[in-house]
Curated annotation (Swiss-Prot):
The organism of origin for this protein: Opitutus terrae (strain DSM 11246 / JCM 15787 / PB90-1)
One GO MF term: rRNA binding
Role this protein plays: Binds 23S rRNA and is also seen to make contacts with the A and possibly P site tRNAs.
Oligomeric and partner information: Part of the 50S ribosomal subunit.
Protein name (database record): Large ribosomal subunit protein uL16
Keywords: Ribonucleoprotein, Ribosomal protein, RNA-binding, rRNA-binding, tRNA-binding
GO cellular component, one term: cytosolic large ribosomal subunit
Signal peptide: none
Recorded superkingdom: Bacteria
Amino acid sequence: MALAPARTKYRKSQKGSRAGNAKRGNTLAFGEFGLQSLTRGPMTGQQIEAARVTISRHLKRKGKLWIRVFPHKPITKKPAEVRQGQGKGPVEFYIAQIRPGAVLFELAGVPATTAKEAFRLADAKLPFHCRFIAREGAVV
């Protein structure tokens, strides 16, 4: 099951602005190593889960993983071959709107080479470019 909010105040939302860089969540808060986005784009709950599974499988249940993003934004879609009008379509899935600089995942308790490889594998699952970052003083 993909990530989705348990409850929302409003069922549907407008597109909103995608401009600018990440002002919050752009530094390491928990772990020693992180995966930081370089470009913007939507990230679905399925993509978050796919990256999480990839990282945890590579780590073989060692270390600690933090997921720093959550899909709050509902995306609607009309069924195929439906005429225009009759309102907005039903919610299909949820996304996290990712901006450049946002830290997506953090790791601790593993060597830097292992973390770097795990994040490289996870980056392949994501729809935008990311980079590996390390905390000041962490042995890389």
